[in-house]
Amino acid sequence: MPPHTLLLRPKLLFTTLAALALGACSPPQAKDPQADASAAIANQVILPTYTRWVEADRQLAISALAFCAATADLATARADFLHAQKAWAALQPLLIGPLAEGNRAWSVQFWPDKKNLVGRQVEALISTGQAIDAQSLSTASVVVQGLSAYEYILFDSKPELADATRKASYCPLLVAIGERQQHLAEDILAGWTGTDGVLAQMSKFPNQRYADSHEAIAEVLRVQVTALDTLKKKLGTPMGRQTKGMPQPYQAEAWRSQSSLNSLQASMLAAQSVWLGVDDKGLRSLLPADQKALAEQIDAAYVAALRALDANDRSLTALLADPAGKPLLDDIYARLDSVHRLHQNELAKALNIQLGFNANDGD
């Protein structure tokens, strides 16, 4: 062994021991429960929901092609649409990142539609006889790009009565919407999972989006509060709460497919998943021990709202047309309102979050 190697060894040993000693004296890394919750919600709740949405839209694109090629029937096409719509509804409390920017959500679903723009613009586009594909559709009005237009074609254009010529006139748009939704969903997911995407930004701080974990948790809660408020509007508007009690069934989110309440339930389940988290790593985990009563109150509010929705097997349209349906809808609305107010007031205060204005203010 060379002599100089022996001479260096004591110095190396001293350096190593010094480093270990300094490490032992350094304070342990402080725990950050908000960072843990943010990362858990992003990875275990939000990302899987976005992934399911992408998968549903891929199937929607396949379904449109199959229906138009007459290798799948109308019932199958409608079932695939309802699956995609349910996957979209589950995203409502999770609109963080690319989908919440640039009005992209309008390209997925156009609601509210107070003037039947969906039906009018679909028919106007079809009547032009122009070639339609996903590329041209991406620059068209958002009214005809998304699920609302797809729903119109499958449920309101009388496809079951259409002859081959009429079906052929709608099919290019149906196929284009399916492809457009698939591409949009895949782009949004890429914005989540890419380098420095939202997933990374909600998992490690600071970054370009969040100065710290508290900002991330604050956005999660703000999105929750806005979504819950929107759910109240989606139920309250057709109930007539903004029109002096006069029901407005055609203002329901999915009146054509009679699936408005199913979408509402999917959104509520997603909101509850953010609250509870996976392995108890949701917003609930951030409440201190002295807020146990509030945690249990929010738990109970979610259970009551979901139970009220689950106990009903009638469509929103049917309930609005039946005087006996009013107390049932009033009960569901009151329970949604309870969940919303608990988040907006008590939970925000307990987590020291200033909510400010939400996206629905001024509606």
Task: Name each model feature, range by range.
Residues 26-29:
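Bacterial signal peptide processing site
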Residues 31-363:
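Mature extracytoplasmic or organellar-lumen-exposed domains after removal of signal/transit peptides
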Residues 2-14:
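Bacterial N-terminal signal peptides that target proteins for export
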Residues 22-24:
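C-terminal motif of bacterial Sec signal peptides marking the signal peptidase cleavage site
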